[in-house]
Amino acid sequence: LKDLRRVLFPGYFGDEMLTPSTSPEYFIGETLIQIERALREQIVLALAYTSDDRDAEEADPARSLCGGTPERICKRASEVCTVFFDELPRIQQVLLTDVQALYDGDPAAGSKEEVIFSYPGLYAIYVYRVAHVLYQQNVPIIPRIMTELAHSGTGIDIGAGAEIGEYFFIDHGTGVVIGETTVIGDHVKLYQGVTLGALSTRGGQRLAGVKRHPTIEDAVTIYSNASVLGGETVIGAGSVIAGSAFVTSSVPPHSRVTLKAQEIT
């Protein structure tokens, strides 16, 4: 993740001094070779481990990616890496929209450089966007490890399976939870403590693959400590959810969901 961040945000992280006379193609090429080697090794280990997990394979045949033979495991790992690196330009493009959203949405941001260097929300989004590509390729274990690493460092828990659009904004971020099957549109803003979660997980593994988390349409703002729960819950485009609201049913576009005003005595 550290090396990938150096590639996706060249000149911001690492010891290299990128100048007009520096060859960015050489720097990025050498770094990508190292990343590919390390990532492929980790994918091989994850696939080998999962192929031996017969109970998991029976519960979800999609988790058996390669039949378990070393040759097929290595071939599958190489295929995953090819797709992953093909996706890096798109990941970078989307991350730059996230930087723009954070800068535009936070008056305290002094510059985009400040956002890139120091905002925990951007770091959590970055890790999610990388992990999501591996998740889409049915790579076991690694996407979860990545997002939990970001969770432990930022307090922001984004499931690798969530689908999140461009210009995504998380302010402060502590306590934000975004479930695995959440769908989020473009230009969405979340504040600290927001939960986009499931109504109940009593079904356990029977609910694997079932949409359990809400859909948040474009240009929605959800303020601090609000909870939006349930796989059938849709928050319509342009809506605003007030802080500490508890929403378990769909909301039409351009709605305002607020709590009853507190009494002052």
Q: Each PLM stretch: what is its role?
A:
Residues G153, G173, K211:
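Short coil/loop residues immediately preceding or within conserved phosphate-binding loops
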Residues Q136-E166:
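Short, conserved active-site entrance elements at the starts or edges of catalytic domains
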Residues I156, V176, S227-V228:
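Glycine-rich beta-solenoid repeat tracts in large extracellular/virion proteins
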Residues I170-I178:
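Glycine-rich phosphate-binding loop
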Residues L1-E148:
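Terminal amphipathic alpha-helical/low-complexity segments used for targeting or macromolecular assembly
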Residues D186-T265:
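Glycine-rich hexapeptide-repeat left-handed beta-helix
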